[in-house]
Amino acid sequence: MRSIVMTAGCSGCGTAAVTAAVARQLALQGKKVLLVEAAAGLRRMNRLLEIREEGLFDFSDLLEGRCALENALLPTHIAGLTLLQGPSAIDWVPQAARVQLLREELSGTEQYEVLLWYCPPGAGALQKGLLPAAETLVLLTEVTPQSIEAAAKTADWWAGQGARNLRTVFNRVGRRLPRDLGYPHLDAVLDAIGARLLGMIPEGADLPYSAATGNIAARLCGESCPLLAVYRP
């Protein structure tokens, strides 16, 4: 079973939307996916996955032993995709030991093939709590100086905490690099961030967006597929 944490260096990078899209694509590719929302007080995944009714229990209830796994899960309209909704309390923080136990419990079953964790931007107690889940850490960034600087700092923090398999996704990529970016090409940006490139998502139309997130989902599962041609050096 693969365990993947998706996050960003700063807000505004589209992390929640991309995480939901990748979860959807994984399920469409035949994977059994559990999407875990670790962002407290937001429950964005309920809206993004068009789940109209909130469940009685959530991620915090499960970790703290107030319910069984089956009582905390929300089905979606997409076959193979299940949601563990985020906690309602805005100040809740997961304990790393309990996250580790949950991952081990799920790994011992054949119920899911992919655990996909939505982690809000930042580098603090909440992110530390998700470290045991980060078999792969996917860091979203936009191609702007501020976003790249934040992504580099966030990648350094995760690496310093012990995360090893760090990957980068560029979101809302145009055909050309911005003139004020300060980097001659995307390879230089990747060097600054310190994470391997996983995918690029273009600005604009739905079809390229779907193709890009589909490629990202496939690459996360070890499949060999080309990056979507977005950027022209």
Identify what each model region corresponds to:
Residues 150-163:
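Conserved C-terminal guanine-recognition region of P-loop GTPase G domains, centered on the G4
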Residues 35-110, 207, 211:
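P-loop/Walker-type NTP enzyme "switch/lid" segment
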Residues 114, 136-139, 167, 199:
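Well-ordered beta-strand positions
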Residues 2-66, 114-119:
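Walker A/P-loop NTP-binding active-site region of P-loop NTPases
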Residues 106, 110-126:
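Glycine-rich phosphate-binding loop used to anchor ATP phosphates in small-molecule kinases
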